[in-house]
């Protein structure tokens, strides 16, 4: 299964990685991206792992960071809708 990101999810990923890099050092920004990539690899291998959340979307929390991958399953595609902070309300 392949993964793709919405424009919004890509922006959220970059913004969060930049925030960690600026406030805690570049290594943490890179660690955030690596954790996101690890989560995508797990989800591509096991797409039903995340529980259903808000209709047809699914939610999978990152291990080391307070973010969740919000995604939808399409035919042979895992589409990332958002990268949501777990303590903020979605807009």
Regions found by a protein language model. Give the residues of each.
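Basic, Lys/Arg-enriched alpha-helical interface segments
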Residues: 1-57, 74-77
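Enriched for short, Lys/Arg-rich terminal
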Residues: 67-68, 72-91
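Short Gly/Pro-enriched turn/cap motifs at secondary-structure boundaries
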Residues: 59-61
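A short, glycine/Asx- and small/polar-enriched loop/turn
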Residues: 63-65
């Amino acid at each position: 299964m392949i993964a793709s990101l919405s424009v919004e999810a890509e922006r959220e990923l970059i913004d969060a990685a930049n925030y960690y890099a600026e406030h805690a050092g570049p290594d943490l920004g890179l660690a955030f991206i690596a954790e996101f990539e690890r989560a995508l690899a797990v989800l591509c291998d096991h797409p039903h792992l995340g529980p259903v959340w808000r209709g047809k979307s699914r939610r999978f929390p990152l291990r080391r960071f307070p973010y969740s991958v919000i995604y939808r399953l399409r035919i042979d595609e895992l589409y990332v809708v958002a990268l949501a902070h777990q303590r903020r309300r979605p807009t």
